[in-house]
């Protein structure tokens, strides 16, 4: 299961709690077609990579986090380690690209 981070405080706490594990966050929106298409694949990846932590942020419900992370398009998948954003990210419903970046950064 992939949980939603509903507030900026939830986001900050999730990164802190993850320690040095890779965290992947799907910045998504309920009205975004490509977001809905990749959502089941994202859940599959959470099962495929049990050593990686997966979350979602709805950009409309948690706009404070979306703004702080400079999200311009959905879906955007950002990667974090030790509480810091990595330079890698994936924009768009690119399953192969997302899987590749997870393997590279975990």
UniProtKB/Swiss-Prot annotation:
Subcellular location: Cytoplasm
Record-annotated active site: 32 (nucleophile), 35 (nucleophile)
Broad class of the protein's primary localization: cytoplasm
GO cellular component: cytoplasm
Domain Thioredoxin: 2-106
Sites marked Contributes to redox potential value: 33-34
Alphabetized Pfam families for the sequence: Thioredoxin
PROSITE patterns: THIOREDOXIN_1, THIOREDOXIN_2
Residues flagged as site, Deprotonates C-terminal active site Cys: 26
A single MF term (Gene Ontology): protein-disulfide reductase activity
Cysteines paired by S-S bonds: 32-35
Keywords carried by this UniProt record: Cytoplasm, Disulfide bond, Electron transport, Redox-active center, Transport
Protein's job: Participates in various redox reactions through the reversible oxidation of its active center dithiol to a disulfide and catalyzes dithiol-disulfide exchange reactions.
Family designation: Belongs to the thioredoxin family.
PANTHER family per UniProt: THIOREDOXIN-LIKE PROTEIN 1
The protein, known as: Thioredoxin
Organism: Geodia cydonium (Sponge)
């Amino acid at each position: 299961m992939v949980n939603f981070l509903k507030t900026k405080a939830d986001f900050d706490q999730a990164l802190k709690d993850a320690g040095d594990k890779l965290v992947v966050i799907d910045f998504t929106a309920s009205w975004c077609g490509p977001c809905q298409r990749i959502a089941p694949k994202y859940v599959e990846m959470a099962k495929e990579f049990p050593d990686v932590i997966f979350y979602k942020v709805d950009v409309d419900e948690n706009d404070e986090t979306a703004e702080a992370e400079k999200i311009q398009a959905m879906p955007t998948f950002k990667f974090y380690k030790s509480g810091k954003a990595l330079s890698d990210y994936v924009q768009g419903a690119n399953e192969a690209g997302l899987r590749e970046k997870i393997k590279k950064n975990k």
